[in-house]
């Protein structure tokens, strides 16, 4: 089993648990160049989203595949979720290690008001 397959298996297992519990979750996806975040309901409806592909976020940071960009995305998605009245979520890291950009996004979202 290669690295990507193992990550996808971990993600599927944890995602199934979140859906069974009926929790709203903050889903992240990380590529070498960008990072994406979405607040998704248990039914699969996207309530808020942010990514380094967006022009507003891309222009505020130097580079899109670094910790500073992840912090900007975390803050933006938390503010957009707060506008919709969402405060408590589960953090779905999609099988990625809780380190580096993933941790930076989570910490920024917590500082901006999301609870998880």
From Swiss-Prot:
Keyword Isomerase listed: no
The residue stretches assigned to a coiled coil in this entry are none
GO BP annotations, alphabetical order: translation
**What keywords are assigned to this protein?**
Ribonucleoprotein, Ribosomal protein, RNA-binding, rRNA-binding
What is the top-level taxon of the source organism? Bacteria
- Which GO MF terms are attached to this record? 5S rRNA binding; structural constituent of ribosome
Pfam families under this entry?
Ribosomal_L18p (PF00861)
Query: Which residue windows are transmembrane per the record?
Result: none
Keyword Nucleus annotated: no
GO CC, one annotated term: cytosolic large ribosomal subunit
- Which InterPro entries does this entry report, sorted A to Z? Ribosomal_uL18_bac-type (IPR004389), Ribosomal_uL18_bac/euk (IPR005484)
Q: Which Gene3D superfamilies match?
A: 3.30.420.100
What biological function has been recorded for the protein in this entry?
A: This is one of the proteins that bind and probably mediate the attachment of the 5S RNA into the large ribosomal subunit, where it forms part of the central protuberance.
Q: Share what the entry says about its subunit structure, partners included.
A: Part of the 50S ribosomal subunit; part of the 5S rRNA/L5/L18/L25 subcomplex. Contacts the 5S and 23S rRNAs.
Annotated family: Belongs to the universal ribosomal protein uL18 family.
Q: What protein name is recorded for this chain?
A: Large ribosomal subunit protein uL18
What is the originating organism of this protein? Pseudoalteromonas translucida (strain TAC 125)
